A protein has these predicted regions:
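Non-transmembrane, aqueous-exposed alpha-helical and coiled segments at domain scale
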Residues: 1-281
Length: 281
């Protein structure tokens, strides 16, 4: 049975999500920060975590963004195969939602229309949109405003199959060590393993939208997430890059089949707020 969705609903929801994600920390990230504050051994690290929480409190009370970099809007649309869109084109609707959200929410406009000419578009469009067709008649929207302090620290490694799991571990640690304080730690580390050059990067990005409380259903991946979180926190980078045990809140790993000749690994790093929002229409 075909279900009709008016794209005005897409506009409305994305507008609201842009504002909410930039003003309020998601429940999983709020809990992660509070847990880290309670367990952090470094006095300076604990002080920084308390300051980050005070910043969140002020943002909530005064309805201002939790960070001055309100990011480039990255949107995942999971569209049920039984959905028919009515109204403006879906891409146009997504960008209109971003436009309204960033304008009405007084969020910083951070997008330039050309990577070389670099003239600001003045409304934070276009968004980066990823589509997938899934069973059903619903539309799931996942929005992640991605700041570029952490985005610039992300890496892709085209490993050889012989590098194996140890090569993957080394790649993840290398990316985090190179990022250091520049990714505004404590960070969330999204990792994509497998696929192709572009697929592993997309996996790593999608991994960042997963709750930090949700672990991989695959046993070896779940064990790898745990091991890498321990190794990353042993680096001592700490909150704000000034030392401590809390360098990362979580390591989220996604995998995909790959070619016999390759082992692509992408590491997409996000800062201590790791903004993301989810809605289903």
């Amino acid at each position: 049975m075909i279900r009709t969705v008016n794209t005005d609903d897409i506009v409305k929801n994305i507008k609201e999500m842009c504002i909410e994600a930039n003003h309020y920390l998601s429940k999983d990230m709020d809990k992660a920060m509070k847990d880290a504050t309670a367990s952090e051994k470094s006095e300076l690290g604990k002080k920084i975590l308390n300051q980050l929480q005070e910043n969140l409190k002020i943002a909530d009370e005064e309805m201002i963004p939790i960070c001055q970099d309100t990011g480039m809007a990255v949107i995942f649309l999971e569209v049920g195969q039984d959905v028919h869109f009515e109204g403006m084109a879906i891409e146009e609707a997504v960008n209109e939602g971003v436009r309204q959200g960033y304008t009405e929410g007084y969020l910083r406009k951070s997008v330039v229309g050309d990577p070389i000419i670099r003239e600001n578009t003045k409304d934070n469009t276009p968004a980066v949109i990823h589509y997938s067709i899934v069973p059903g008649d619903k539309v799931k929207i996942t929005l992640a405003p991605k700041g570029f302090g952490s985005e610039n620290m992300s890496r892709v490694f085209m490993l050889k199959p012989a590098d194996g799991i140890e090569g993957v571990k080394e790649a993840i640690l290398t990316a985090v060590k190179d990022a250091g304080p520049n990714a505004c730690p404590p960070m969330v580390v999204g990792v994509g393993i497998g696929g192709t050059f572009e697929k592993c990067a997309l996996l790593a990005k999608k991994a960042l939208t997963r709750s930090v409380e949700e672990k991989s259903p695959v046993e070896y991946v779940r064990n790898l997430e745990k091991e890498m979180l321990e190794k990353i926190n042993d680096l001592g980078i700490g909150p704000g890059g000034l030392g401590g045990k809390t360098t990362a809140y979580a390591v989220n790993i996604e995998t995909y089949p790959t070619h016999i000749a390759g082992l692509p690994v992408a590491v997409n790093i996000c800062c201590h707020v790791n903004r993301h929002s989810h809605r289903v229409i």
